[in-house]
Amino acid sequence: MTCTDQKSHSQRALGTQTPALQGPQLLNTDPSSEETRPPHVYPDRLCHMEPANHFWHAGDLQAMTSKEFHLAATQDDCRKGRTQEDILVPSSHPELFSSVLPMALEEAARLQQPQPLPPPSGIHLSASRTSAPTLLYSPPPSHSPFGLSSLI
C-alpha cells in the first residue's frame, strides 16, 4: 500500500506542477506584457548605440591626425638627411625615437585642441579677435599700392 500511496502522491505532485508550469507560460504569451516590453528595449539600445558611434568617430579622427603627423615626421627626417633604414629600425637609433615620441604627443594634443595657439602659423580670425584685427587692418593700406602697381 505504501508503493501505491507514493505513486499517487507523486502523480498528485505532477498534477499540481503542470498548472504551475503553464501559468508563467500564459503570462509570457500575454499580449499586454509583450506590448510593454519592446518600447523599453529599443530606446535603451538606441541610447547605448549613439555614444558608441560618437566614440568610434572620435577614434577615427584621432587615427587620421596621428597618421598625418607620422607622415610629416618621416618627411622631416628625410629632409634632415636620414635614410629610411634609420627611420624604420628603432634599435639602431633609440635616442632618435625618444626625441620624436614626445613631440608626436605634443603635436597630437595641439591638433585635437582648437586653441588660440595655432594662429601664428595661419590666419584665424575667430581664434584671436583682439590682436588679429589690428594686424590685419594696418598692413593692407601699405601693401595695396604695391600689389596694384605690380599687377599693372
Curated annotation (Swiss-Prot):
InterPro entries: SEEK1. Residues 1-31 have a biased composition (Polar residues). Residues 1-39, 132-152 are annotated as: Disordered. It comes from Pan troglodytes (Chimpanzee). This is Psoriasis susceptibility 1 candidate gene 1 protein homolog.
